[in-house]
Curated annotation (Swiss-Prot):
Gene for this chain: yacG
Name this protein carries in UniProt: DNA gyrase inhibitor YacG
Taxonomic lineage from the root: Bacteria, Pseudomonadati, Pseudomonadota, Alphaproteobacteria, Hyphomicrobiales
Annotated region (Disordered), positions in chain: 51-72
Signal peptide annotation: none
Keywords assigned: Metal-binding, Zinc
Cofactor names: Zn(2+)
Similarity section: Belongs to the DNA gyrase inhibitor YacG family.
Quaternary structure and interacting proteins, as annotated: Interacts with GyrB.
Residues passing through the membrane, by range: none
Pfam (any one): YacG
Function as written in the Swiss-Prot or TrEMBL entry: Inhibits all the catalytic activities of DNA gyrase by preventing its interaction with DNA. Acts by binding directly to the C-terminal domain of GyrB, which probably disrupts DNA binding by the gyrase.
Binding site for Zn(2+): C17, C20, C32, C36
GO molecular function term, any single one: DNA topoisomerase type II (double strand cut, ATP-hydrolyzing) inhibitor activity
Length: 72
């Protein structure tokens, strides 16, 4: 008789790091290291990654009440 081995989520291999392609680590998931996580954060902060949306000119915002009070 063969024994069945139950696999848990911890046994499942993680996807590769999106920055360098090395195996990701649980501690820094989805990255392989804090360095790769920092590189990714820097790309977001440097606006190399963007989420598509309407241009700022196309967006309309209602006037804020504190803006109205300042013009008086």
């Amino acid at each position: 008789m063969s024994q069945s081995v139950k696999r848990t989520a911890a046994d499942k291999p993680l996807a590769p790091c999106p920055i360098c392609g090395k195996p990701a680590r649980t501690e820094t998931k989805p990255f392989c290291s804090p360095r790769c996580a920092d590189i990714d954060l820097g790309r977001w902060l440097g606006e190399r990654y963007v989420i598509p949306g309407p241009e700022e000119e196309e967006m309309s915002y209602p006037p804020r009440s504190d803006d109205e009070n300042r013009s008086r």
